């Protein structure tokens, strides 16, 4: 009887341990630097400094990054951001032209840390055999792409759909759907998350380099456009449809035991509810949607997840949790599209017109930030609130730990898959690679590469042929610390670049023209008389004045022009609510040129691209 009692006690203790809530909060301040008093760093500037960084970086803990050869750790990623050299999965060195000011590793919450475990030769879990020794040195070659493509396209999905009886018991006991999956190891998941947290704490250096604990919430909709609210262990739908991905950034040292992932819910509104609950418990976070361009029109809809028209409550709910949006990255620009901005001659800049993770066309309507701005204005006109009053950031979405934001040193983002010019379709394929693609054409995942023939020459024809070097998040903050930079995110004093370190200030207010541009106190007066980018200017009787200050990247090309794009609602005769509209204005020209008062455009200065 004593033996039976002891074993029952052991089972009970194990169940209690396994049921530790992933939403419990842990304080990791003991792992980071000593707390820094606000305003105490040497670079503190009450008029604010400009800081450049990236809030979208993947390492080996992301399932897709590991599948395509990445073994870089979070420590490697932060080393790279601070100017160090790390290796690409194909073996060449990667190093930035100059260090960044802040960085966040944002590995997928979905299956975080599990694929590396599947590849461990000591792992005997049934179903994981195809992953064994995936990233040992002799396997990290371009010849391994067909195998990796098949693992990505089908094997992960089939393993995620697999479940067993004990998994169902754990799910019913904990409410965590991840426990249903037979090959999902919660300990490996939590261990990887702790490694991400530990690394961010180790590399955070107030006044010099800022890190944030963060991860990616990888939600999506089905290809048909219908919403899927939960993972169905009895048979999932298409692996990827309309992209609804977000990066979730924690402000400080207090972090949850687990990230909230798609295995808990695909509904972004459930993520926001989770974030609201954390905020009530003293933990501030924000979510940053990305790649709306690949959302098939579903990132900026006028309905909520359940299909009801959105109103003020939804607008406040979303803005409280998503004050920023990622407007540009390697997978294209989400600013606007030629079909949405036909009068903007640069609306086709770095467009990716397919959905994320697939080759299907992504519907522009509802997929681009500028249209979301206009829809937000219309909703506000209808007294329904504005859920799309975003600040802007850029990012890389690198899956190698290393941002690739310079075309002269572009190594794309998915490791072995797109790490060579041949793989990206930039130069012809050698005969042996052509034969490799042909021989594996029937494998799942073959669509990731494909072939295209010009004359007698073959090129790869991948879905990522439209990708390009990008991008950076830029903030104006008093000092290079978590509190100061996160507060800048909150007030949306941010902007995006496609990779260059352009310095930009923008203010709106009244009587700004009374201040001389050469006045040493220009910025201080601009803050006192107006509001900076991201702020709300309360309407007055007079038209607002704008102050724009821009400086080119010292390592890049000169600036050709400065534009302001006006979004507004215009009432037609008999219409109670205005229709959204936009107008592009050039406001400053290079080379001493003047803006044409009729076209609102700068004259062509004859600048050419040196190819």
How would you describe each model-predicted region?
Residues 165, 169, 176-181, 255-256, ...:
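Flexible glycine/proline-enriched surface loops and loop-helix/loop-strand junctions
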Residues 254, 264-269:
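Conserved, charged catalytic cores of large soluble enzymes
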Residues 16-18:
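C-terminal motif of bacterial Sec signal peptides marking the signal peptidase cleavage site
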Residues 227-233:
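Intrinsically disordered, low-complexity acidic/Ser/Pro-rich regulatory regions in eukaryotic proteins
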Residues 249-250:
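Long, charge-dense tracts
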Residues 20-74, 78-81, 85-134, 182-185, ...:
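C-terminal functional module detector
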Residues 1-9:
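Bacterial N-terminal signal peptides that target proteins for export
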Residues 130-174, 586-611:
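Low-complexity, serine/threonine/proline-enriched polar segments
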